[in-house]
């Protein structure tokens, strides 16, 4: 369902891409989630959000969680909302860098409400 009036005129279409990993996974010497945020910055992508979870269930059925003494198993997500061209550049870069990570890619409408 489209919103009426000026809202729909300013809306853009693209993708919400979310990468799922754990705090202790790395790419090179850097935590993978932080590396993904830096990769987005390097590619000129205007925003990325790194979120930590309390607990998650991995694809292999293993529970991953933070505990009082060890944060290394903490599930983390990096989420970006990008246009189609940015998504293509991002995935090409990840392939070039041989990044191994699970992701979801959803078609979305996005924009900003109000005046800046």
Features from the language model and the residues they span:
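Positively charged, small/polar-rich N-terminal and surface patches that mediate targeting and assembly
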Residues: 1-116
């Amino acid at each position: 369902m489209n919103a009426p009036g000026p809202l729909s005129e300013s809306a853009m279409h693209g993708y919400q891409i979310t990468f799922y990993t754990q705090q202790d996974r790395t790419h090179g010497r850097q935590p993978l989630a932080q590396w993904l945020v830096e990769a987005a910055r390097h590619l000129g992508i205007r925003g990325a959000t790194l979120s930590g979870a309390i607990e998650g269930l991995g694809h292999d059925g293993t529970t991953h969680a933070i505990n009082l003494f060890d944060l290394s198993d903490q599930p983390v997500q990096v989420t970006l909302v990008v246009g189609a061209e940015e998504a293509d550049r991002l995935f090409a870069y990840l392939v070039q860098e041989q990044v191994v990570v699970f992701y979801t890619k959803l078609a979305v409408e996005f924009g900003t409400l109000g005046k800046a």
